[in-house]
């Protein structure tokens, strides 16, 4: 039996009545966003819109982005990444569970000093995936060049995020490279391992 999105009571400011809203709407009021699935265009558009709204509402307060994601679409992930860098608000990234592939990239994209993970989080980095079906050789060649260009761009960005050399990032991401929360901190992908909400910002 599938579990639906939980609802919680919420009282609008100035109202004496509570109404039931879904948990993600309620968390959004507190500037808490959640990436808890594979990264795709739909979730990217939703997160981009929410970050832009929260930033325009009050860019002096941080936005909290909780991540428990196996990764997903590179182009969708880059839309989220660019928005994290675009908004004036600090973006606190918090790994709960797994941040793999594009999930790990977004974890590292948070505001420096405000990228954290819970103690039993797992982080995995690797090169972007690309596949071809039955297509013309010239199309396959074009796609391969684009994948290599994206790989190079992601590795340079990861190098900037972590302080690791481009060559080390290139070597480590050649295959799946798993890190514990503490290892991710030592690697420079996050800044702290936390066990209490007060440690997040």
From Swiss-Prot:
Originating species: Prochlorococcus marinus subsp. pastoris (strain CCMP1986 / NIES-2087 / MED4)
PROSITE patterns in the record: CLP_PROTEASE_HIS, CLP_PROTEASE_SER
Keyword Hydrolase appears in the UniProt entry: yes
Subunit structure: Fourteen ClpP subunits assemble into 2 heptameric rings which stack back to back to give a disk-like structure with a central cavity, resembling the structure of eukaryotic proteasomes.
Lineage of the organism: Bacteria, Bacillati, Cyanobacteriota, Cyanophyceae, Synechococcales
GO biological process, one term: protein quality control for misfolded or incompletely synthesized proteins
Family: Belongs to the peptidase S14 family.
Active-site residues per Swiss-Prot or TrEMBL entry: 101 (nucleophile), 126
Main location: cytoplasm
Keywords, alphabetical: Cytoplasm, Hydrolase, Protease, Serine protease
Compartment(s): Cytoplasm
EC identifiers of the protein: 3.4.21.92
GO cellular component: cytoplasm; endopeptidase Clp complex
Listed InterPro entries: ClpP, ClpP/crotonase-like_dom_sf, ClpP/TepA, ClpP_His_AS, ClpP_Ser_AS
Record's catalysed reaction(s): Hydrolysis of proteins to small peptides in the presence of ATP and magnesium. alpha-casein is the usual test substrate. In the absence of ATP, only oligopeptides shorter than five residues are hydrolyzed (such as succinyl-Leu-Tyr-|-NHMec, and Leu-Tyr-Leu-|-Tyr-Trp, in which cleavage of the -Tyr-|-Leu- and -Tyr-|-Trp bonds also occurs)
Function according to Swiss-Prot or TrEMBL: Cleaves peptides in various proteins in a process that requires ATP hydrolysis. Has a chymotrypsin-like activity. Plays a major role in the degradation of misfolded proteins.
Family matches, as PANTHER family: ATP-DEPENDENT CLP PROTEASE PROTEOLYTIC SUBUNIT
GO molecular function terms noted in the UniProt entry: ATP-dependent peptidase activity; ATPase binding; serine-type endopeptidase activity
Identification of the protein by name: ATP-dependent Clp protease proteolytic subunit 2
NCBIfam families per record: PRK00277.1 (NF001368), PRK12553.1 (NF009205)
